[in-house]
Design a protein with these regions (language model features):
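Extracytoplasmic
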Residues: 5-8, 63, 119-122, 131, ...
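Membrane-interface helix-loop-helix junctions at transmembrane boundaries of multi-pass membrane enzymes
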Residues: 21-24, 182, 222-232, 296-328, ...
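Active-site lumenal/periplasmic loops and adjacent helix-entry segments of GT-C-fold
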Residues: 23, 27, 31-169, 401-405, ...
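Aromatic-anchored segments of alpha-helical transmembrane domains
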Residues: 39, 146-150, 194-199, 238-244, ...
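Transmembrane catalytic cores of multi-pass membrane glycosyltransferases
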Residues: 53, 159, 196-307, 339-340, ...
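Hydrophobic/aromatic-rich transmembrane helices and adjacent perimembrane loops
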Residues: 161, 338-368
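Membrane-interface transmembrane helices that cradle and orient dolichyl/undecaprenyl
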Residues: 169-186
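Alpha-helical transmembrane segments
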Residues: 215-216, 297-306, 359-363, 561-576
């Protein structure tokens, strides 16, 4: 994995080009790739962000607006109030941008997901250039990331993970520079970026830490280096995130986290780490870029006998090898035990593989250009024509992103914004509840209580019973229990790949009871209708808002702020000392 051609010079050149231009041509190419990545993501998913999880993320953004500028601890919009302890960075960023721009949460959610996802090609470019010192390789990898169908697949749901993945190459770059220079500033950047990855997506962070800690351990053992980095990085992250984890620990206790880790994540057959029906074979068939990368790797073996792995193993090579091995092993784990949610974590392997693919393509280009056969000078660049294959796959994707929302649903959302403040609404569980709450700001009975630590809340199941039970007395018992004021029923056929929950017709017919229910509003469209029922009994929602310990919260923020300032002062002192010497 050495340097090729004149690319060794690229790392030491200044921002200005050799011809006197203000911006080097590779940055112009990179910017064009970034713009194309933005375009292809909107083009591939015209329904963005009306999918499953994004509606939930927008509800969390509403909660973040309520607690701004603090990171929210409570989400009042689901389950009569719940703790807010899951993937906070993306919705908080949406709320922050809404505060300073005044734009809607839906628009900001769409653009933040696309921009952070497209920015992955930028962070991959800089990591690749750090790894190989080869501008061509870095640009090819950036392009492959821009058109990778595996990366585009994330837009169906996983916006927080998209953000976390974009931080990972930057964190890896800073870690490489820290190992090379042992400068505290790079270590601090690793800690800050790692903390952001944790806040963005816990599960992404878990795999990320697995990769970097194994790589550091292998490097320390191989070079007989001090293992202090293995301890420093986690300790610095824990200190920086005190504002976030301390209130959670105070509420639930350490044992709850142990139970969650062993009982809900690692061991059960159905969990956040349970494999979907995606296998390594399906990954290969889905990603043409992967097939090209593997094929070109074989070609590189034939072109060059003295392979890069026979060279001196430095930390960048160790890190990239561990990244490939761990992510590939997790994909292949489906053959032995379902430990990974593959449709999310294919991205780890995809990123590492496409970084290597960029280098292999640049290597083959150099070797072909060096061949003394009759042809034009830059014959090696014909290899770049292979990039048309993943480009075609991205532009002509056969993946359908199922969306939410018929015209009558949208009209109902607008009407529901006029409901009395604090009204409690029942909607069909899952995506319907997410989006009616996200767009109208109403409080919904239900949500995803499975993500709450220490809660045994049945609002989601009870919402389903209220809507679908044919027994009106059973409906009313639950309605009185929670103090429900309204019931929204989207009643459509499954047309045009629009998400719609199947409803029990007998359960819907049971609402034709004028003693308990009245139609408050009704909208229809060519596919069906959306009706809002008012509960005739004047009930008060049985809110039991979760309590925030402001003393513990203030302590957590104080520790995090003092820690960050202390790290900053230590870095400044070290830098000043280095300049003085």
């Amino acid at each position: 994995m050495g340097k090729t051609g004149n690319d060794r010079k690229s790392r030491s050149t200044r921002a200005a080009g050799s011809d006197g231009t203000l911006i080097k041509k590779e940055y112009l190419i990179l910017f064009a790739i970034f713009l194309f990545a933005i375009f292809i993501r909107f083009y591939s998913d015209p329904s963005i962000p009306y999918h499953y999880d994004p509606g939930k993320n927008i509800v969390y953004a509403h909660a973040a607006l309520d607690s701004f500028p603090l990171v929210p601890q409570v989400n009042p919009y689901f389950n009569l109030g719940e703790y807010y302890e899951y993937q906070v960075l993306f919705p908080y960023t949406v709320a922050f941008l809404s505060k300073i721009t005044g734009l809607s949460l839906v628009i900001l959610t769409s653009w933040l997901a696309v921009l952070t996802g497209a920015a992955l090609c930028l962070t991959v470019y800089f990591l690749s250039r750090e790894l190989f010192g080869n501008t061509t390789a870095a640009l090819v990898s950036a392009f492959l990331i821009a058109v990778s169908r595996i990366e585009i697949l994330g837009y169906v749901n996983y916006y927080p993970q998209i953000m976390a993945m974009t931080f990972i190459p930057l964190a890896a770059l800073c870690l490489i520079r820290y190992v090379k220079t042992e400068r505290f500033g790079y270590l601090l950047l690793v800690a800050i970026l790692s903390a952001l990855i944790v806040l963005a997506s816990y599960l992404t962070a878990l795999v990320y830490f697995l990769v970097i800690l194994i790589a550091l351990a292998v490097w320390c053992l191989r070079e007989k280096k001090s293992a202090i980095s293995l301890l420093l990085i986690p300790l610095m992250i824990v200190a920086l995130l005190t504002f976030f984890w301390l209130p959670i620990i105070w509420r639930h206790g350490i044992q709850s986290f142990v139970d969650i880790a062993t009982g809900d994540i690692l061991t059960p057959q159905i969990s956040a780490f349970t494999n979907q029906p995606w296998t390594l074979a399906s990954f290969l068939s889905y990603s043409s870029a992967t097939v090209i990368a593997i094929g070109l790797g074989i070609c590189a073996l034939l072109l060059y006998r003295k392979m890069p792995w026979k060279m001196e193993w430095d930390f960048p090579k160790v890190l990239l090898t561990v990244w490939l091995a761990v992510s590939f092993g997790l994909i292949g784990s489906y053959l032995f035990y379902p430990i990974l949610w593959v449709d999310r974590y294919f991205q780890f392997f995809d990123i590492a593989l496409l970084i290597v693919a960029g280098f292999v393509i640049a290597f083959i280009i150099d070797k072909l250009n060096a061949l003394k056969i009759p042809a034009f000078r830059y014959k090696g660049y014909l290899v770049l024509l292979l990039l048309m294959i993943p480009l075609y796959g991205a532009v002509h994707s056969d993946t359908t992103f199922v969306r939410w929302g018929y015209p009558s649903d949208m009209e109902m959302v607008e009407y529901m914004q006029t409901l009395p403040a604090g009204s409690l609404v029942v909607a069909p569980p899952g995506i319907q509840g997410f989006w009616f709450s996200a767009l109208s700001g109403v409080h919904i009975l239900g949500g995803e209580s499975a993500q709450m630590i220490g809660q045994h809340y049945s609002g989601e199941a009870d919402s389903d019973t209220i809507i679908n039970s044919p027994n009106v007395n059973q409906k009313m018992d639950l309605i009185r229990k929670y103090g429900v004021n309204y019931i929204v029923i989207p009643y459509h056929g499954n047309n045009y790949a629009v998400w719609n929950r199947v409803l029990n017709e007998e359960g819907i017919d049971a609402f034709n009871n004028s003693l308990y229910f009245a139609v408050d509003k009704y909208f229809s469209d060519s596919s069906g209708s959306t009706v809002l029922l008012k509960v005739k009994e004047n009930l008060t929602p049985a809110y039991a808002p979760e309590q925030v310990d402001w003393g513990i919260t203030a302590t957590g923020y104080l520790i995090s702020i003092v820690t960050l300032c202390g790290f900053g002062y230590f870095w400044y002192s070290r830098r000043k000392q280095e300049k003085g010497s």
